[in-house]
A protein has these predicted regions:
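Beta-strand-rich binding/interaction modules
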Residues: 73-82, 86, 117-120
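Short beta-strand elements
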Residues: 126-138
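Short alpha-helix in the alpha/beta-hydrolase fold that links the catalytic acid
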Residues: 1-8, 80
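Short, aromatic- and glycine-rich surface loops/edge beta-strands on solvent-exposed regions
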Residues: 113-126
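Catalytic histidine neighborhood in serine/cysteine hydrolases
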Residues: 10-27
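Surface beta-strand/loop "capping" patches
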Residues: 31-34, 38-79, 94-111
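Conserved strand-to-loop "acid loop" that flanks and positions the catalytic carboxylate
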Residues: 1, 21-22, 67-68
């Protein structure tokens, strides 16, 4: 999708993605997430950086590797087969998985019905979120 192309214009060492299904759209709402400040303070100040996703692999399950110096709190795999709705109205489903904090991995089963697009969101103990770029089995 075009969103992915835009994300990849940012150099890898600065690229942080935070996808929020159901987030309202607008100038005020766009600056509402605390992740924006967290990223900015870690990039140019002395703030603690968000979780860093280091690898995504997809075979018989989905596996995301990450590194962080702060306690990873939760992770979910969001997916959709909805290709007709615009982003504001797209229907997303979630799948839980296994978050291995010591190894820095999250593993989730693939949905039985398949999926067209998906992403994983990881949250740290501060509830700061970071997402993978869009994942597609194609």
């Amino acid at each position: 999708p075009q969103y992915q192309k835009s994300c990849r214009l940012i150099p890898q060492h600065f690229r942080e993605v935070c996808i929020r299904p159901g987030m309202r759209h607008g100038h005020y709402e766009g600056w509402e997430p605390a992740e924006i400040r967290c990223f900015f303070e870690s990039a140019v100040g002395d703030g603690y950086p968000p979780i860093r996703i280091t690898d995504v692999s997809l075979d018989d399950s989905l596996r995301v590797s990450f590194r962080t110096g702060i306690f990873p709190y939760s992770a979910e795999f969001y997916y959709t087969n909805d290709t007709l709705s615009d982003n504001a109205h797209r229907v997303w489903h979630t799948v839980g998985g296994t978050l291995n904090r010591e190894k820095g991995t999250f593993t989730a089963p693939l949905p039985q019905e398949g999926f067209r697009f998906g992403f994983v969101t990881l949250k740290d103990v501060r509830l700061m979120s970071v997402s993978t770029e869009f994942i597609s089995p194609e």
